[in-house]
């Protein structure tokens, strides 16, 4: 009876871990690297040269920041973009924008859609209604997910091993007393 209950718990834990890994972190991760600044990161499976960030303020004003600048083109000093490759992540390319702290704004990562640049496709979106929605930057979103999954899997394996040892001992004791 105990074995059946524990096995169900382990199966549920493993299914939760698989769901987390399959989902990845395709959404946006928002944090504040220092006071007055905001960092938004989006994990993608493919890197493309046609990416840009769009910030829509509550006043209706739009700001667009290219992720990749041409060599002759100057970048924006107020908004900084960053890309890095994460080898252990579900979606290996992390695109980030560091911008002045903005409340009541919507931030989107967009890609030009179509052969001739007509239209756009939204890859990530984040709404910033209050300061409570922003946390301090500690661990990258994908690494945090990876650590959580590893911790859950490790706990599951240790629990299963301990249960197996306990079960084998109880079976051995019962069979010894039954034989005598």
Curated annotation (Swiss-Prot):
Residues 1-27 form the signal peptide. Keywords: Host membrane, Membrane, Signal, Transmembrane, Transmembrane helix. It comes from the Viruses. Disulfide bonds: none annotated. It is a single-pass type I membrane protein. GO terms for cellular component: host cell membrane; membrane. InterPro entries: HHV_UL121. The keyword Membrane applies. The chain crosses the membrane at residues 143-163. Its main location: host cell. It is found in: Host membrane. Belongs to the HHV-5 UL121 protein family. This is Membrane protein UL121. It comes from Human cytomegalovirus (strain Merlin).
């Amino acid at each position: 009876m105990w074995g059946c209950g524990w096995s169900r718990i382990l199966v549920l834990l493993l299914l939760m871990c698989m769901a987390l890994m399959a989902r990845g972190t395709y959404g946006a991760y928002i944090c504040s690297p220092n006071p007055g600044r905001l960092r938004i990161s989006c994990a993608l499976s493919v890197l493309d040269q046609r990416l840009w960030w769009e910030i829509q303020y509550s006043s209706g004003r739009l700001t667009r920041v290219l992720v990749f600048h041409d060599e002759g083109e100057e970048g924006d000093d107020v908004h900084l973009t960053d890309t890095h490759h994460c080898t252990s992540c579900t979606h290996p390319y992390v695109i980030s924008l560091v911008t002045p702290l903005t409340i009541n704004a919507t931030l989107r990562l967009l890609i030009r859609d179509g052969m001739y640049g007509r239209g756009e496709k939204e890859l990530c979106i984040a709404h910033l209604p209050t300061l409570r929605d922003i946390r301090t930057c500690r661990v990258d979103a994908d690494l945090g997910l990876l650590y959580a999954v590893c911790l859950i899997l490790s706990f599951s394996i240790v629990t299963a091993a301990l249960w197996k040892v306990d079960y084998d001992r109880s079976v051995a004791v019962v069979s010894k007393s039954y034989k005598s």
